[in-house]
Amino acid sequence: MSLMLAALILTVAFVICSLTGFTQRKLSGGRLPKCLPSFPLIGSLLSLRSDLPPHLLFQKLQKTYGNLFSLMMGPHYAVVINNHQHAKEVLLKKGKIFAGRPSMVTTDLLSRGGKDIAFGKYGPAWKFHRKLVLSALHLFGDGSAGIEKMICQEATSMCSTFERLNNAAHDMMPDVTRAVTNVICLLCFNSTYEKEDPEFQTMRKYSQGIVNTVAKDSLIDIFPWLQFFPNENLHTLKQCIATRDSILQKKFEDHKANYSSDSANDLFNILLKAKMNAENNNSSVHEAGLTDDHMVMTVADIFGAGVETSSTAFAWMIIYLIHHPEVQKKIQEEIDSNIGFERTPKMSDKGNMNFLNATIHEILRIQPVSPLLIPHVALADSSIGDYTIPKGTRVIINLWAIHHDEKEWKNPDAFDPGRFLDEDGKYVCSSSESYLPFGAGTRVCLGEMLARMELFLFTSWILQRFTVQVPPGYPPPDKEGKFGIVLQPLKFKVQLKLRKAWENRGLHD
């Protein structure tokens, strides 16, 4: 058995070495970006050995290799972009050319072979699916107003829970995550979860399991043949995906059983209606990307990405408000003067909340939820700047480096909402072009509008009622974070101290 295994490994190694040599010969033409040292079989992996997370390592390598450099990820040729000029060329100017996604073991498992939006193959079916999801975001009432009502409903429940804690030290993020999850559930399933619902707890467990394991299996994505050997992380990932799929499949079957043409009130029903229309028009549901697999994976994609993006961004907001009480106080003063205490905040207040808007922008700059965007792939021979980019090249955009570029931002590592205000204290969208918190172009994040609404409403609702601080005897939250699918903060405890002004509201009427 050991001889057979050794023979298999040698055979695979020979094939990969041959492919690597072929790839390097193919890349010999044109002006290519400066490349990290590369060796047969392993590519540039030796140059990537570091205690630094990938986004910080790429930022460090930028000083030696430039804003655009290349590397071999085993047999795969890739380029890393560290500045906004090249990033916007890829995402905007040449968005369709670079709209591809790499096929990788972990993402293929997550998406059943790219049958979703995040990892799906760019083409007519993918664009149709994306259009359907955008339709779902405009389901409730007049679009964003309906979504606002859902967010405020969850904010009410969340703040009531916090008031009952009576200043006790606790981890607030499970309650925040449930609120964010319920908004997504209403969009996808037209249902919500109570705090102690066992299914909700299961969903949180599998979601966290996916976040924890995907980033650890990068070698399997570089060398797919490793999946055939024992791997604890891959086993855990498969278990989490199986649990996710079991829950989503049940919801999908329930929707199919109860579907009627008048029930297009959530994403599953919108997808089912599109499938029925395609069948009535004798169109291929497979070509339209409307098989059962496509529909379940699209909902899984929106559900997973929507929850992790918004809850992670809000966690960073709380952490920085704790570390910068002067910023928190200034937001509270803005709330007090523009909203008061006789009503709760709403989206129509956004135009008067300059400092809160600036703070949200600064949070998304200094701690981008996804420091490395999902890799793109060149669908044809092309170029970035003055460099040749062959078809099939993987393109990694280092959003962290773009948001911490010393040439574009003054003191980029300092937390300063004022950088998004003009001389009169009015909010400006960005003081630099080096700002892409949700990506841009063809593959821009679908949940951008929802994430911004949740950040604005949840932050303003909480700060209207509470002051967020470190509980006595506890350390302040860590600002480093843990690299994975998202840049996730480490767990932390807070004390939500009820504001006197909120307690005394209405006493002087």
Swiss-Prot record:
What's the main place this protein lives? membrane
Q: Which reaction does it catalyse?
A: a C21-steroid + reduced [NADPH--hemoprotein reductase] + O2 = a 17alpha-hydroxy-C21-steroid + oxidized [NADPH--hemoprotein reductase] + H2O + H(+); 17alpha-hydroxyprogesterone + reduced [NADPH--hemoprotein reductase] + O2 = androst-4-ene-3,17-dione + acetate + oxidized [NADPH--hemoprotein reductase] + H2O + 2 H(+); 17alpha-hydroxypregnenolone + reduced [NADPH--hemoprotein reductase] + O2 = 3beta-hydroxyandrost-5-en-17-one + acetate + oxidized [NADPH--hemoprotein reductase] + H2O + 2 H(+)
Q: Which GO terms describe its cellular component?
A: membrane
Please give the superkingdom of this protein's source. Eukaryota
Q: Which family does it belong to?
A: Belongs to the cytochrome P450 family.
Ligand binding (heme): C445
Quote the protein name from its UniProt record: Steroid 17-alpha-hydroxylase/17,20 lyase
Q: Where in the cell is it found?
A: Membrane
Recorded metabolic or biological pathway in which this protein acts: Lipid metabolism; steroid biosynthesis
Please give the function described in this protein's UniProt entry: Conversion of pregnenolone and progesterone to their 17-alpha-hydroxylated products and subsequently to dehydroepiandrosterone (DHEA) and androstenedione. Catalyzes both the 17-alpha-hydroxylation and the 17,20-lyase reaction.
Organism of origin is Squalus acanthias
